UniProtKB/Swiss-Prot annotation:
Protein name: ATP phosphoribosyltransferase regulatory subunit
Keywords: Amino-acid biosynthesis, Cytoplasm, Histidine biosynthesis
InterPro entries registered for this protein in UniProt: aa-tRNA-synth_II/BPL/LPL, HisRS-like_core, HisRS/HisZ, HisZ
General remark: This function is generally fulfilled by the C-terminal part of HisG, which is missing in some bacteria such as this one.
The keyword Cytoplasm belongs to this UniProt entry's keyword annotation: yes
Encoding gene (name): hisZ
CDD domains (alphabetical): HisRS-like_core
SUBUNIT field: Heteromultimer composed of HisG and HisZ subunits.
Subcellular location: Cytoplasm
Metabolic or biological pathway, per its Swiss-Prot or TrEMBL entry: Amino-acid biosynthesis; L-histidine biosynthesis; L-histidine from 5-phospho-alpha-D-ribose 1-diphosphate: step 1/9
Function: Required for the first step of histidine biosynthesis. May allow the feedback regulation of ATP phosphoribosyltransferase activity by histidine.
Gene Ontology biological process terms from the UniProt entry: histidyl-tRNA aminoacylation; L-histidine biosynthetic process
Molecular function terms, GO-annotated: catalytic activity, acting on a protein; histidine-tRNA ligase activity; transferase activity
SUPFAM superfamilies hit by this protein: Class II aaRS and biotin synthetases (SSF55681)
Length: 326
């Protein structure tokens, strides 16, 4: 029976889906190369340490014939960090890429474990320039892919990092707080601040409401703390969204946005659309990634677009003349 069944979380892509996803991927890649991003391809298999210092059960891990622990790549950004640290590549430099990534989801969640991504990494450039180029190139990629009615949502990794550092919680309590933040649990966060008081009590209690139109969220957040580092992070969000106003007249913030990956250190962004429940673009600043590989800190901004999700967003607009439509 297993000869004809798929492994957990894997799917065949047929006809309309296969053709459309191929076209989306190549349109985005061609666009990025014309904008000066150098194409890079990295291996599907890597030593597990490239992605994490400890074995991550969310990754596909196995031992090769030499006894080395190998992972199917869960992301490509970490691999580019390895490339920068281990080769003679000179910075500043801009990369573009596309390829398969793999994340293990439990069977009951019903999620796909294989995705096609395309993305960019902008390394060694002035941070404001890199952030603007990253956001604008992500917008252009969505446009060339035919996505309509999408919105950029921004946050800053340092906001929650400051709170977690101040609280200095044991791992179990840290995970509990992260769950309350992710779920926007008003009751959970209020109870948590009673048990774990800090200078950020007001911020934590209001986090579930600190999302929406950029100016309104910034105004409310600034009234909740006088911590200089926290306010500086808010200022950087205001500066970036103001500089992007001509390209993105409408932006939103979500200050409760937890980093999608652990290496984000600054401004982060996601893109949401009408027809897809989750973000189909995620990106941000990750200056400290290279230190994991023994290299010096570099300014770095990147994003990845999920081609599978983009297909869901444009599916209804794509005509297909074949015998089967998936």
């Amino acid at each position: 029976m297993k000869k004809t069944t798929l492994a957990l979380g894997m799917h065949d892509k047929l006809f309309k889906r296969a053709r459309t996803m191929y076209q989306i991927e190549h349109c985005i890649c061609d666009l990025l190369m014309t904008k000066g991003f150098l194409r890079i391809e990295t291996p599907t298999l890597e030593h597990f340490e490239v992605f994490s210092d400890v074995v991550d059960n969310g990754n596909y891990n196995f031992f090769d014939k030499n006894g080395d622990l190998i992972s199917l790549r869960p992301d490509i950004t970490s691999q580019i960090g390895r490339v920068i640290a281990s080769t003679q590549v000179h910075t500043p430099i801009k990369f573009s890429y596309s390829g398969k990534v793999f994340n293990y989801n439990e069977e009951m969640r019903g999620l796909s474990n294989e995705h096609t991504q395309a993305g960019v990494e902008i390394i060694g450039f002035p941070v404001h320039q890199a952030l603007e180029e990253a956001v604008i190139s992500a917008k252009e990629a969505l446009d060339v892919a035919g996505v309509r009615n999408y919105k950029f949502e921004f946050s800053h990794a340092q906001l929650l990092q400051l709170i977690f550092e101040e609280l200095n919680l044991p791992a179990v309590k840290e995970a509990e707080l992260a769950t309350y933040i992710r779920d926007k649990s008003i009751t959970g966060l209020k109870e948590f601040t009673k048990e774990n008081p800090s200078q950020y009590d007001k911020v934590l209690e209001q986090l579930p409401s600190l999302f929406g139109e950029t100016t309104a969220v910034l105004t409310e957040a600034r009234q909740l703390t006088d911590n200089e580092s926290f306010l500086t992070a808010l200022d950087s969000l205001e500066v970036l969204t103001s500089r992007l106003a001509d390209n993105l007249p409408e932006t939103t913030l979500d200050l409760a946005q937890l980093p999608a990956v652990p290496y984000y250190t600054g401004i982060m962004f996601k893109v949401f659309g009408d027809k897809v429940p989750d973000a189909f673009v995620s990106g941000g600043r990750y200056d400290k990634l290279f230190e994991r590989f023994g290299a010096t800190e570099l300014t770095a901004v990147g994003w990845a677009i999920d081609i599978d999700s983009v297909y869901q967003a444009v599916h209804d607009d794509v005509e297909f003349g074949g015998d089967m439509d998936d």
